[in-house]
Amino acid sequence: MRTRRVNPQSERDYCWHLTSRNKKSLALDLNSEKGQEILRELVKDSDVFVTNMPEKTRQKLKIRAVDLLPINDRLVYGSLTGYGEDGEDSHRTAFDVLAWWARSGLMDVVRPSDNSSPGSIPIGMGDQPSGVALFASIMTALYRREKTGKGGEVYTSLMANGAWSNGSYIQAGLFNADFPDRQIEAPLHPFGGRYKTKDGRFLLLAIIDAAKEWPKFLKAMNLEYLNEDEKFSSFKNLNSNFRDLYKILEEQFAQYNLSEVIDKLKNSGVTFGFMNKSNDLSDR
């Protein structure tokens, strides 16, 4: 079944409050001579100029780095595009769902199985980290200007930042790694599973040092009797019977609300987390 996500409904523009509050703005018609004149006067005394327009539009509006840096050689020119400054797609417009999410492979990676329909992303999920990447580039260029007296050009793209977020799997592809078919099933081991609680929430385990943390987990969750079961009495046996163990853990977690599980595990020394909903975070 395919579903469509509906964004949160509010009388207040929450996206604007997150990204644009306290900003000051000035509208210029860069197709007019007066607008171009005002822009160039502003550039003379500016530290940073940022654009997200594709190359052809910049050329038309005369806002390329080659247009503005001669006016002020201390200017740091920052560019954020969909697909980069060069290449056959450099002229294309994009949003984060297209370039950061879909084109980078992230959209495919998070699918539960190869037959699952791709999912979408929250508003700005790719824009925010890409903006931080551009900010870091600009700050580095400003530091360089402190040392050299000269500005320059820095740039990044939505696709580049998406590729970095998916870097481990892209690197695997570069190594010609085998990408097995994905199936919706229990995890490969119970130490890294996602478990549903009585109140419909999800708890995640990330027990890497099993020799140290597994006994603590069993004690915290009142499962020490499993040590007496031959199927789980050693890590070798446990791994051989992990599907049976996974079912036992599913049943155990299903007896408790998430808050109860957190109380049991929070001081146990076990590495775990839980899935929040967005409106949960306003209380924390």
Task: Go through each PLM region and give its residues.
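Conserved beta-strand edge residues that scaffold enzyme active sites
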Residues: 57, 279-280
